[in-house]
Amino acid sequence: LEEGLPSLGLRVRTGHWGIAGEPPVLLVDFKPLWQEKDTLYFELWKAYALESDKGYGDYDESSLFAIAAARLMESIAAWRSEERTIAIFNEWQTAMGLLYLRQHAPQIRTLFITHATTVGRSIAGNDKDLYTYMDAYDGDQMARELGVEAKHQVEKLAAHEASVFATVSKLTAREAKQLLGREPIVLPNGFHVGTSPLTAPMLSKRKKARQLLGAVASRLYGQTIDPKQAFFISLGGRYEYRNKGIDLFIESLHHFAESYQGERDVVAFLLVPAWEAGPRADLQYLLTHPQEEQSNPLQYPMLSHWLYNTEHDRAVCHIRHRGLDRADSRVKVIFVPCYLNGLDGVLDLSYYDLLVGMDLTIYPSYYEPWGYTPLESIRYGVPTITTTLAGFGLWAEEEQMTKPFASAPHRPVHVVERTDTNIPETIEMISSLIARQLSLSLEEQKEQRKKAYELARCADWKLFYRHYEAAYEQMK
């Protein structure tokens, strides 16, 4: 394979991915294709009337990478011509590669998976009502209105040209059919579940995470927050304020704080990468000098890292507006605006190593085709709140009606009904669920964490891969 690659005019590295199974991997440098860009785009315009001249931002880089990957696939298929070849393309970013194969290697069977539609995400992200008017939306017209014509067009073409078209949930299947004009099959997202969170090593990780979370909260707010007594909540994900439910996360905490009379500190962590300017030196110093006395909260106690746009950041403004940065309140919010890769300079733990220390996660999403974050949460034994507008939420709601979850007194996944218009009711429900979780005994919490892990195992790739096998059968 390596001997034949130079003729492609692309720089390629071969190796193995360092995960279980060590699958072979090809890394391709697509930069040489920049000089061919106009020719490649013209070829696809002739074949499909694809208007790539309307693309902007990451359109060109995504498209050229997709074509480079498709050329590698074409080469591999020719090398192993006696075998049936299947090429899988995910999202609009790789869609042009599928179109390239249709022109240059039509014998390769293709699967196109959209994990969200370009137009659907844009409608939701622009504060328009996606679900009330879903059956009336025209994908092409909305793409023009929202300025995403090229991305939508290549995505729609791939959906129609693919041997099999798929998406990740029933929720998004309806959206894809309406906006892209072809009904997809559903391939739900699985997860490698791994070790139980109730084993000794995982419990040790949980203890370490809680000690760190307590220390950070204590230093930011200038008071002792005992990790053994505190109740830790988190939301993680992309900084899509409405789509990911960050707005409702803060509003629900505010609503809860207004009536909370308990003695336990409730600390909510917003784990969302933003325009981070680096770790706080004052916080770093205090964390590394535990004997240093402190009588007052730090400036901007809701921030673990500095931001370039602190005064204008939407989450910071919202937190301050709702008084969730007050040291005298039992309910506090801490915004962690960095990528949690274990090297952020303050927490220095990965996202998963922090997640295991939480008592509850909240993902009140408005637009969530699947929703890995609540699935990741229960994999680590942390109960979660999600909504009926998340594909995972609908799956979990259905799964929890079966044994052994139907009889469980405290379900690990709370699925809150959310629509375009019921925001006050959603906030009220999330607030009451926080209170309910706080009231559980240690034994009830332990049983709920156990059920959370058991539910996560129902979404293991070992079980969900059968959906892919069924898709491959359709390609014969």
Short names for language-model regions:
Residues 1-476:
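Catalytic cores of nucleotide-sugar-dependent glycosyltransferases that transfer UDP/GDP/TDP-activated
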